[in-house]
């Protein structure tokens, strides 16, 4: 199923807060609605957020009225979308790309500007699918025969324009006949592993076993995991990785058990402007996400909650970063620079 699609000047977005109980698409006609969908995690996953924000810019220009300067108006659209979530760098990458396109065509007619922005958003969307397939192809190199892969959160088709990053590697292994099974962490507090990854893999006929987050170490100790593959929301210049909370713990467990730990992400997730993971802003979300599952209270309503959405895994715990341009291995600072043509 599609994470999102564009039709009749409307962004149709799969509401991932309803999965797996209900498959429902919401119709978004304004950039404000796109911003709300990102904040509320109707759409989530770094590449998917970027693509949605790009279409949000298109909806922004389509909602323009002649009562103010177009550039001032569009800058406000840009800032509104940019301020939705602070950690996933693909959001800023996609918005910067859309803004650059606007600056290229700003002297053209309004209709030409709108068409140029729509074409750019479409390019971001369809390019992401191709990037993910390349990630899958490169990742296949590190997957042993008859592999059992553990993954965290959801870095699949639902988190991207299609195919997935970490699950792109899983899909490539499945298609090549190299995959035995997948262990999916449930991923508290919003259960993306249980609700989304398990759902997505079952839809594809892939053998998946769901485990609680705190079972991962024991599963590894039993020799049931050959490698760990996760996605990323931001990779810094030194190879540190911000990803869904709980990733850091998995990386330490994998290292303790001698299990390769790979991160799968497109080049757009790498932020060369940040020297290390200490520079990454970590989003802290509503405490009720921990106090409740759905609408049901599972903890005392007055209890204090710490709810960071992401953690940072230091590069020393990462075996390799699987990108659409190849697999980056240590030393990361040097080899990430090479990935972008630097020396």
Swiss-Prot record:
Coiled coil: none annotated. Its EC number is 5.3.1.23. Keywords: Amino-acid biosynthesis, Isomerase, Methionine biosynthesis. Belongs to the eIF-2B alpha/beta/delta subunits family. MtnA subfamily. InterPro entries: IF-2B-related, IF-M1Pi, IF_2B-like_C, Initiation_fac_2B_a/b/d, M1Pi_N, NagB/RpiA_transferase-like. This is Methylthioribose-1-phosphate isomerase. Substrate binds at residues 44-46, 85, 192, 243-244. Transmembrane segments: none annotated. Pathway: Amino-acid biosynthesis; L-methionine biosynthesis via salvage pathway; L-methionine from S-methyl-5-thio-alpha-D-ribose 1-phosphate: step 1/6. The active site is at residue 233. The gene is mtnA. GO terms for biological process: L-methionine salvage from methylthioadenosine. Catalyzes the interconversion of methylthioribose-1-phosphate (MTR-1-P) into methylthioribulose-1-phosphate (MTRu-1-P). GO terms for molecular function: S-methyl-5-thioribose-1-phosphate isomerase activity. It is an enzyme of class 5 (isomerase). The record marks 153 as: Transition state stabilizer. It comes from the Bacteria. Gene3D superfamilies: translation initiation factor eif-2b, domain 1, Translation initiation factor eif-2b, domain 2. It catalyses: 5-(methylsulfanyl)-alpha-D-ribose 1-phosphate = 5-(methylsulfanyl)-D-ribulose 1-phosphate.
């Amino acid at each position: 199923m599609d994470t999102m699609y564009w039709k009749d000047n409307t962004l149709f977005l799969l509401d991932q807060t309803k999965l797996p109980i209900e498959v429902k698409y919401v119709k978004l006609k304004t950039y404000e609605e796109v911003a709300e969908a990102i904040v509320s995690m109707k759409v989530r996953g770094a590449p998917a957020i970027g693509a949605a924000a790009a279409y949000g810019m298109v909806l922004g220009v389509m909602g323009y009225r002649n009562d103010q300067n177009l550039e001032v108006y569009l800058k406000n659209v840009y800032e509104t979308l940019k301020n939705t979530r602070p950690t996933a760098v693909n959001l800023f990458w996609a918005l910067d790309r859309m803004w650059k396109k606007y600056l290229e065509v700003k002297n053209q007619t309004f209709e030409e500007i709108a068409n140029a922005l729509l074409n750019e958003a479409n390019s971001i969307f369809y390019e992401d699918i191709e990037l993910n397939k390349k990630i899958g192809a490169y990742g296949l190199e590190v997957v042993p025969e008859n592999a059992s892969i553990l993954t965290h959160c959801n870095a699949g088709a639902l988190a991207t324009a299609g195919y997935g990053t970490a699950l792109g590697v899983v899909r490539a292994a499945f298609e090549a006949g190299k995959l035995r099974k997948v262990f999916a962490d449930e991923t508290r507090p919003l259960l993306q592993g249980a609700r989304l990854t398990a759902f997505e893999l079952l839809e594809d006929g892939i053998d998946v076993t769901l485990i609680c987050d705190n079972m991962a170490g024991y599963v590894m100790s039993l020799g049931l995991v050959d490698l760990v593959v996760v996605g990323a929301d931001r990779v810094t210049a030194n190879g540190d990785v911000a990803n869904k909370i709980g990733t850091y713990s998995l990386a330490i467990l994998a290292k303790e058990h001698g299990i390769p730990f790979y991160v799968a992400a497109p080049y757009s997730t790498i932020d060369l402007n940040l020297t290390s993971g200490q520079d990454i802003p970590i989003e802290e979300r509503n405490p009720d996400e921990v106090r409740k599952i759905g609408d049901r209270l599972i903890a005392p309503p007055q209890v204090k909650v710490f709810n960071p959405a992401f953690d940072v895994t230091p590069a020393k715990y990462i075996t390799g970063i699987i990108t659409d341009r190849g697999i980056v291995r240590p030393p990361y600072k040097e080899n990430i620079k090479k990935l972008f043509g630097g020396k």
